[in-house]
From Swiss-Prot:
The chain crosses the membrane at residues 24-44, 71-91, 105-125, 404-424, 427-447, 465-485, 514-534, 543-563, 1481-1501. In the N-terminal section; belongs to the glycosyltransferase 2 family. One of its GO terms (cellular component) is plasma membrane. The gene is bcsABII-A. Pathway: Glycan metabolism; bacterial cellulose biosynthesis. Keywords: Cell inner membrane, Cell membrane, Cellulose biosynthesis, Glycosyltransferase, Membrane, Transferase, Transmembrane, Transmembrane helix. This is Putative cellulose synthase 2. Residues 768-785 have a biased composition (Polar residues). It comes from the Bacteria.
Length: 1518
């Protein structure tokens, strides 16, 4: 419940008032996440995405100025939403797999980006709500305070480094009888032993150095007994209040196994020291200890970091001691304890301080060990697996482990632009606009949100520098450790080193120097490509984008190289800036009060007005007293310098007590490191400026350094050769503070040595397995294609001539279909042919073929020729003349008996260029037949045979490719029944004609010549004028032309006329061999949406064999003529995110040693757009034999091809082009040329993933497939509105339109409703509406039917209506077409309708899901001409938008009306579409999702914080 967690604040009050505080917290989280996921997956146009991005960025900048955890959580959700949109865009719109190299590079980059996004999510999860735990008070009764063992492990560190830590630990503010400080010396050095005796500390060594530091600690646990153990690395000096400020939590919570505190480093790390702007940037480790660990504490997933931590002995012993399986024993130990149910905690207060790694190479070595250890944990004891952890803890560990996998992704980001600049592989296929509106907001939100979260702990862009400095070193370690997790050993990190002078550390940066050189070369390549190479726009954009990418990578790499410029380090003891009140007393007893500027273990600087030069060389006493911290210092010092009011002093330490006091003053103060986070809040631009400043420091010459001697070795430092103790288990108990002097110490030492060693040896745990472990094992600090032009029409004047005399026509090959140029024959493609059509009502009496062209002059005349055949009958031979390669014109007479209706004129080439052997693919094997060659045919008409069984002949000839004319006689053009019947017959002819041009000129009388169809009531059915006895069909001679035939469709009533028409179109096979017949009505099945026979079914896979014959999918020769598969689709198929449809294609190629299947291929194209090429290579042997058992395609090669929806139209064509190569090409062996290849007719097309949904108005849908009228095959949901008294021109346009519908659906228009314009006012039309007629003919009906159109036709002009014009601002928010169409509003449309046709589409005023398409113009002839444009393939691309004006042969298209939709989608897909077209709604939905998720997460986090720490005084702001 919300009420459980919200106690204050406006949000709490609002929720309480509305009752929402009783809603479970997971409800808004789930709703918000689902909404964010949905919004993140919606695809929109890049321009619209730009506005969404502007909105999110603006909101980010506004909210980022306000404080509060709730706003931070919301900004994280907003950032994740923007990042989600980016990654979905990357995965769905920018990836191309053109070849294996591009695929590999693109996938690698995608994996790197997925890693980055996962890291971002985990970072938000960890840092969303830092717990900000405060110290827990101790019991007032000190008798209840527990005993504590303090362990200071060491191996090979210098004693000078360890002394301070031990002295600081001995000075801890804790009861002396309950404080035991031990040096755990795995180096067994006598000097350490002697120091422990002198200081009163305990000293423990062991016989073998098994498992390095972890083994050392385990041994110490075995020989000590305090309930708590505190561990300090040998350079981590604690403050005096360390135990008082930490033990309270361990006592308050018995289940707490670990309390970790920060590792603070008082010396600068390599990045701070070496970079020009480094000292103004937070240390590299601050983010982990200042933010990440605090976030881990929130989830009870604090990591043990090996030092500055309190461990409960019971907990660590319960897991068998400190983990020894990995080189990061600390984190692994915490993981094991958490698996057992122990809790962990973190106190974000630096209570100890140590030395950072002095040099970059040492820093790299330390991080390499950490990376190896975390990857070992991932491989050996993966927190994501196994029992014992909550999911929150698993995610925290996943974040830690995955962080050290950054090397490969970081390197991938740096070098990805090289893929294009060097290899020519474009691995992000996107425009600059798309990248700008998707990638840049993703980066911007991530940077700004992380900047807000990380604030003073980590500055923007510096993580990139830190990671780049390590990446190339970690790549190998990452791979090796993943593959061999047991490999690798514990390495100690050297600290406290000195540098006499600065130098450039090539060993630490040489990989990045090499990388920088490669990037510089890439930069030069990019500049060269941009400036000196000429490219198309896309290539130029790619060059610019990748060059900019290289520049960014180069900046990061140069900054990482700058870290390698090591600065001089000549101080053993780094200075700490602090202002402390001190009193300086000189040798004369004069006291000077002042404040320190800085202090160190070596000395200090004091500001005092009494400093004089004569004090230099003298000795003074420095006193510092702090009652709060219990520190009282009085230590002598020597004056090194005294000027400008500042004394520079060096400590003159006399004994161990003086050293202890110095350590206490420098490190023991409770607030010593309170300013560890005193950095200005991050500002990304300022941070970026610091990066450039650091790069400038790399390029700037360093001034000469004056030589400075290194600090001489002090008496406490080790000599060159150390004296070692014997390998044995030895325990020296610490001496209480009261006994740390003189004889008492000696006695204690003796007792410890003689009495405790046996006890220690008795307590020592059995030695673990030591295989592979030696005494030298180190340890240290842990951590639709273009439609071709139609064939030229034969001159109608010639075609329509009617005469008993012979008619001679000459057709060029171009007229016959050779529209692409000459017929070219080659050795591998020796056969070419053309169709020669002879009309069915004519017979050839004479024919002559005239050829011209050229034959290769390199051919052998006696062995080369071109053979000409007609219908496989020999016509003639073209012989080779090397001296005259061009031939013609050459004429051949053709026997008229060879001709049928559809004739094949073939040319077969046989050629050789040498006598012994020939290569069919040699370029000199060729012959060309000019496309201006011609065939002359003399024909004569034959007497017509008038039988109904021959229908549709003689009115339709299937062999004709020219425009077909079927004159229609309507004695009464205003008769609605006759119009419906004539429209039905016209649609039948349209179905038969299919793609051929067809027109129906209308007259009221029988034409003077030729054939015609007469439709009407009570028409004569014979030459004597007899009348029909019922619904009747009859073929009679044209009274004006004995060669012509009139098909009479009649009846006694209008209803009988329609019955006769239905019988004609639905059952022509039952009419019989008679000239006339009374017919019966035909019962028709109810049609269903989208069941038009022309449309490919979309509810099941469709076999190729259902669309074409198997012979159409076969070809002969090595390069047979292309095979085509035509198919029709409803144009309203919609898929989610444009997912492609699938074609499952099976290809058969000849086996045996004929074709080189590996190099042979088949090219697949869709509507003349290339899709893919596939090899003809068969499957492997196992697959081949298994397919023989279960697969009908055995022996064929299968491929799945994606058909992009944007390449599919109403009328489509798949093209398959084989290109085979002979297996013995070039050898002196004859290659068979009569091979056959095919596409299996059982191959399938699958459109099942499509939904019927379309955005309207769209005239291209209508022009391509008569949509939306063709939705019902019989047009049963279509109403045609005509003038009340249509003239013949308008009626002809109506019949032509019905023919177009029939050709589009392959089904007669049996259900169309025809009504007059005057009927519209009192009987609104139903369904989709077609309007035909001039504005004058339609009267007021036109304005009513087009009420929702933005256009107004008035006074022979078409304009944008006043209502639409005044709402121009509204159009700014509408969806606009980006196909180059004009907008009527912005184009100020005001076009005269003079000798022009107008095609207009709009939403129906009667039904929002219905459409109106209107054909109008100034004359009926213009309307008729506009309808005929629907049958002209060349005009179809011009019919788009919602308005088309046709003036002569010129089309102008407009899109002005708002979009409406027809069809239906599932709810989720409808929402996806809606949001994809309405960026404002998408933006608001995204904000709503982010807000809901943020609200729920905020409440959940707040409540969880209360569970972790219930008291307000023990935690920070909630």
């Amino acid at each position: 419940m919300y009420g459980t967690w919200f106690t204050t604040g406006k949000v709490t009050d609002l929720l309480a008032r509305t009752g929402l505080d009783r809603v479970p917290v997971w409800v808004p989280v789930v709703l918000g996440v689902v909404l964010m996921a949905f919004v993140g997956s919606v695809r929109i146009d890049p321009a619209l995405q730009g506005w969404v991005s502007v909105g999110t960025v603006t909101l980010l900048l506004v909210l980022n100025r306000r404080r509060g955890r709730g706003i931070t959580v919301f900004l994280m959700m907003l950032s994740l939403l923007v990042s989600l949109r980016y990654i979905v865009w990357r995965l769905t719109a920018t990836v191309q797999f053109s070849n294996w190299l591009q695929t590999a590079l693109a996938v690698l980059l995608l994996l790197a980006e997925a890693y980055a996004l996962m890291t971002l999510c985990l970072s938000y999860f960890q840092m969303a709500w830092p717990l900000r735990r405060r110290e827990h008070p101790l019991p007032e009764d000190m008798a209840q305070w527990p005993s504590v063992d303090v362990f200071v492990p060491s191996y090979n560190e210098e004693l000078s480094l360890v002394r301070s830590t031990v002295l600081g630990a001995l000075d801890l503010d804790w009861p002396a009888d309950r404080l035991n400080v031990y040096i755990l010396d795995d180096g067994r050095r006598k000097a350490f032993h002697d120091f422990a005796v002198e200081a009163g500390a305990g000293y423990i060594i062991r016989a073998e150095n098994n498992h390095a530091k972890a083994g050392n600690l385990n041994h110490a646990l075995a020989v000590t007994d305090s309930p708590f153990a505190v561990i300090f690395d040998c350079d981590h000096v604690p403050t005096r209040g360390f135990l008082r400020r930490t033990i309270g939590w361990m006592m308050a919570d018995p289940n707490l196994a670990l309390l970790q505190t920060p590792h603070h480093f008082y010396a600068p790390d390599p990045f701070q020291r070496n970079l020009a702007g480094g000292m103004h940037v937070p240390p590299e480790g601050n983010m982990f200890y200042g933010l990440v660990q605090d976030g881990n504490d929130f989830w009870d997933a604090t990591f043990f970091c090996g030092s500055c931590a309190i461990i409960r002995r019971e907990a660590v012993m319960g897991i068998g001691g400190f983990a020894t399986e990995t080189v990061t024993e600390d984190a692994h130990t915490a993981l094991k304890m958490q698996r057992r149910g122990w809790g962990t905690a973190y106190l974000r207060e630096p209570l100890a301080a140590g030395l950072a790694t002095e040099r970059l190479i040492l820093h790299i070595g330390q991080r390499v060990r950490w990376a190896r250890g975390m990857i070992q944990i991932m491989r050996l004891d993966n927190p994501m697996l196994g029992a014992g952890l909550r999911w929150e803890q698993r995610l925290c560990y996943l974040s830690a482990m995955s962080h050290f996998l950054f090397a490969i992704p970081r390197l991938t980001f740096l070098v990805s632009p090289l893929a294009f600049l060097f290899l020519g592989q474009n691995i992000i296929a996107a425009s600059p606009l798309a990248i700008s509106v998707y990638a840049l907001p993703h980066i911007f939100h991530s940077v700004i949100t992380l900047s807000r979260i990380e604030g003073r702990w980590r500055y923007s862009f510096w993580s990139e520098i830190y990671e780049t400095s390590l990446a190339l070193f970690l790549v190998r370690i990452t791979i090796v450790t993943l593959l061999q997790p047991h490999k690798g050993k514990f390495n100690v990190t050297d600290k406290g080193g000195l540098l006499a002078r600065g130098y450039f550390d090539w060993d630490a940066v040489y990989p990045n120097v090499i990388l920088a050189g490669v990037l510089c070369a890439a930069l030069l390549r990019g500049v060269f490509g941009i400036v000196w190479q000429f490219h198309d726009r896309l290539a130029l954009q790619s060059f610019i984008l990748n060059t900019l990418w290289v520049v960014i990578s180069l900046i990061i790499v140069l900054a990482s190289i700058a870290v390698g410029r090591e600065t001089r380090q000549t101080r053993n003891a780094p200075r700490v800036s602090v202002r402390l009140p001190v009193v300086v007393t000189d040798a004369h007893g004069r006291q000077m009060e002042g404040h320190t500027h800085d202090i160190s273990l070596g000395g200090l600087a004091v500001g005092t007005r009494l400093a004089t030069p004569d004090m230099v060389g003298g000795e003074v006493t420095v006193r510092y007293d702090s009652a709060r911290d219990g520190i009282h210092v009085g230590v002598p010092a020597r004056v090194l310098d005294a000027r400008d009011g500042t004394l520079r002093l060096r400590w003159a330490v006399r004994d161990l007590e003086d050293e202890r006091q110095v350590v206490s003053m420098v490190f023991g103060r409770n607030d010593a490191w309170a300013g560890w986070a005193d950095f200005a809040p991050d500002r990304p631009l300022r941070s970026l400026a610091m990066v450039f400043r650091s790069i400038g420091g790399l390029l700037r010459r360093r001034p000469a350094e004056a030589p400075r001697a290194l600090h001489e070795m002090g008496e406490g430092e080790l000599p060159a050769t150390e004296e070692k103790l014997e390998k044995q288990s030895f325990v020296l108990k610490p001496v209480p503070r009261s006994a740390r002097h003189g004889a008492t110490a000696s006695a204690a030492l003796f007792v410890a040595f003689t009495a405790l060693v046996p006890a220690a040896m008795a307590q020592e745990a059995p030695s673990p397995d030591q295989s592979g472990v030696t005494a030298e094992t180190p340890f240290g600090d842990s951590n639709t294609g273009v439609v071709p032009d139609a064939l030229p029409a034969i001159d109608p004047a010639v075609a329509d001539r009617i005469s008993d005399a012979e008619v001679t026509r000459t057709l060029t090959f171009r007229n016959l279909g050779a529209t692409t140029g000459p017929l070219t024959l080659r050795g591998y493609s020796p056969l070419q042919g053309l169709d020669v059509v002879v009309p069915a009502n004519r017979v050839v009496t004479h024919a002559q073929l005239t050829l011209s062209g050229a034959l290769s002059p390199s051919l052998l005349p006696e062995a080369s020729a071109v053979t000409v055949t007609l219908n496989e009958q020999y016509v003639g031979t073209l012989k080779v003349d090397p001296q005259h390669p061009q031939f013609g014109p050459v004429s051949f007479d053709i026997d008229p008996l060879y001709f049928t209706g559809d004739n094949k004129l073939n040319f077969h080439f046989a050629g050789e260029y040498r006598r012994d052997c020939n290569d069919l693919f040699n370029e000199i094997l060729w012959a060309r037949i000019s496309d201006m060659s011609r065939i002359t045919l003399t024909t004569v008409r034959i007497t017509p045979e008038r039988k109904l069984s021959r229908l549709p002949a003689p009115f339709f000839d299937p062999n004709q490719r020219s425009t077909l004319r079927v004159p229609v006689v309507l004695p009464a053009t205003g008769d609605r029944g006759a119009l419906r019947a004539a429209g039905l017959v016209a649609s039948w002819f349209g179905r038969i004609a299919d793609f051929r041009k067809l027109s129906f000129p209308v007259s009221t009388t029988i034409p003077a010549s030729g054939n015609a169809v007469e439709v009407g009531v009570n028409l004569p059915v014979d030459a004597e004028g007899g009348r029909p006895a019922g619904p009747m069909l009859a073929e009679v001679a044209n009274p004006n032309d004995r060669w012509g035939t009139v098909l009479v469709v009649t009846g006694r009533t209008a209803q009988e006329v329609e019955v006769a028409a239905r019988a004609l179109v639905f059952s022509p096979d039952t009419l019989g061999g008679v000239a006339s017949k009374v017919v019966s009505d035909v019962s028709l099945e109810t049609r269903h949406p989208y069941d038009a026979p022309a449309f490919v079914p979309t509810d099941r896979p469709v076999r190729f064999g259902e669309l074409v014959g198997a012979a159409d999918l076969q070809g002969g020769g090595f390069a047979p003529a292309g095979m085509t598969l035509p198919f029709h689709l409803p144009p309203d198929l919609y898929t989610w995110r444009g997912r492609p449809f699938l074609m499952n294609m099976w290809v058969r190629a000849p086996g045996g040693p004929v074709v080189d299947l590996e190099t042979s291929r088949v090219d697949v194209s869709l509507n003349n757009n290339y899709l893919q090429s596939y090899t003809l290579s068969p499957p492997g042997l196992w697959r081949k034999w298994s397919e023989r058992l279960v697969n009908q395609h055995a022996g064929a090669v299968g491929h799945v091809t994606a058909l992009p929806p944007w390449l599919l139209f109403g009328q489509n064509q798949l093209q398959f082009n084989f290109d085979a190569r002979p297996i013995d090409r070039g050898a002196c062996r004859r290659t068979p040329g009569d091979i056959h290849m095919s596409v299996d007719s059982d191959s399938t097309l699958d459109f099942r993933r499509g939904y019927h949904f379309a955005e309207m108005p769209n005239l291209s849908y209508f022009a391509e497939a008569a949509f939306p009228f063709s939705r019902m095959a019989d047009l049963s949901e279509t109403t045609v509105v005509l003038p009340d008294h249509p003239d013949t021109g308008t009626t002809g346009a109506f019949l032509d339109l019905m023919g177009f519908f029939g050709a589009s659906t392959w089904y007669p228009a049996a259900g169309v409703t025809v009504m007059g314009a005057d009927e519209v006012a009192h009987t609104p039309p139903k369904g989709d509406i077609v309007v035909l007629g001039t504005a004058a003919q339609l009267g007021g009906a036109a304005s009513g039917l087009l009420a929702r159109s933005p256009y107004v036709i008035h006074d022979r002009h078409i304009t944008v209506g006043q209502r639409m014009g005044l709402q121009g601002i509204w159009y700014l928010f509408q969806d606009h077409d980006h196909a180059g169409l004009k907008d009527g509003v912005t184009a100020n449309l005001n076009a005269p309708i003079a000798e022009a046709g107008v095609l207009l589409a709009a939403q129906s005023p009667y039904d929002s899901q219905r459409s109106v398409v209107a054909f109008t113009g100034d004359t009926p002839e213009r309307i008729h001409d506009l309808v005929l444009s629907l049958r002209n393939k060349g005009d179809l691309p011009s019919l788009q938008g919602d308005l088309v004006l046709k003036n002569g042969d010129r089309f102008t298209s407009y899109r002005t009306a708002p979009v409406y939709t027809v069809g239906s989608l599932p709810l989720w897909l409808r929402l996806d579409w809606f949001l994809g077209h309405h960026p404002s709604a998408l933006y608001l939905a995204g904000l709503a999702g982010a807000g809901l998720a943020a609200l729920g997460v905020w409440a959940w986090l707040r409540g969880w914080s209360r569970k972790r720490i219930a008291r307000d005084d023990l935690t920070g702001e909630l």
